[in-house]
Amino acid sequence: MIHSLILSDRRNNQYKTLGILIFIIYPILSFPFILKGILKRERWAYLLGAILMGYIGMLYPPAGDMYRYAEDFNLYKELDWEYFWIFMALKFDYFLPLLSWILGKLGAYPESTRFLFVACSYYLLLDLYHDTTLSNKDMTRRTRVYSLILLVPLTFSIYLFRMGFAQVVLVYGIYWFLMKNRKKGLFFIIFAVFIHVSYMPFIFIAIASRYKIFNFSSNVFCYLCFLLIFIESSSLGVTLLRSLPFSESLLVHLEEYISGSQSENLSSQFTVRQLIAKYFFNIVYYITLYQYYVFYKLNPQPLKIKRFVNIFIIVIIMSSSVPILHARLLDVLKVFLILSSLCFMNNSFRMQRLLRIVVVFTIINILFSFWQIRFFLKFSRIDVLFTSSSVSIDRFSLYG
């Protein structure tokens, strides 16, 4: 028995060493090793998988907001500490400017921020996968594979932006603060606000979730879900915003999302295929909401998690007059509901069937997301990933 355990441990170490060596020499070939290591819940595989996705993010072209990030990066690196803080006074999302300034002073290129955003996002997602699959003893190997697809999607492009990175940090913090009762979760929730200020309501939601006033019956929760799905616009979000004790400059910044250029609902400009993609996302969202409702009735979850979701849904309903913020909050809700469902997933036929449906539509959404960024992929340098070693990729820069 002991001899077989020693041999198994030795084989695992050899497999790990081989995977790391291949990653250094030719990272794309190490993907099968990384995937197998992830399914076996090996930390080294999480790290290499996150770095590999970070490479893809680094080689992606600086389009849209990423171009502005690159321009700001090149500006910040030329500033001394005193002038940099003058620029910081005009910002409300402090993390990216500070990170850009530090990396710029160290001689890094703008691509380094994209690498860190994507790599850190995937490592946090893989850590959630690790803890979720370990905590739920009822999970089969197939369910673990489903969990990997749902929690660690290949849609890397959303993590290139502050919003996507902040969303991952936020969900990570909510998980540890509410589900695991760890104080480090509150740190990540606050950190997410410094990455993107629009997630500030979650600080209040996390604190309010400890109060019993938000204990709702399953019927009240069902009514909230009905409002969430069918209410399209409301002035409650604007009224709530004006009642909060924020500085005037911050209120002006936030109101840009309500009455400024950020408030426009772009759905009317979508093509037929983009609308189809949106509806597929909504299907995933509705199914996960129904899944959570079933768990809500069965009562397997701690009350503080239920209270958190109840308050969260109320805030989303009130934000319906702010299309871009409303959409972002719905994204966070979808991820959290999936995470919550996986934590309490059982092997009943109904739950497994719903899980398979969510996985199928999630895969379709992933394919749609690649179709949507096909134009940018043509101008990316992802081909470098197939011809270079890790050392060469680390030194690679579109500006070099």
Residue ranges of each PLM-predicted region?
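Membrane-interface alpha helices of multi-pass inner-membrane proteins
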Residues: 153-155, 184-208, 317
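Membrane-water interface signatures at transmembrane helix termini and the short loops
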Residues: 155-170, 174, 195, 290-348
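Transmembrane-helix motifs of polytopic, lipid-linked glycan transferases
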Residues: 116-135
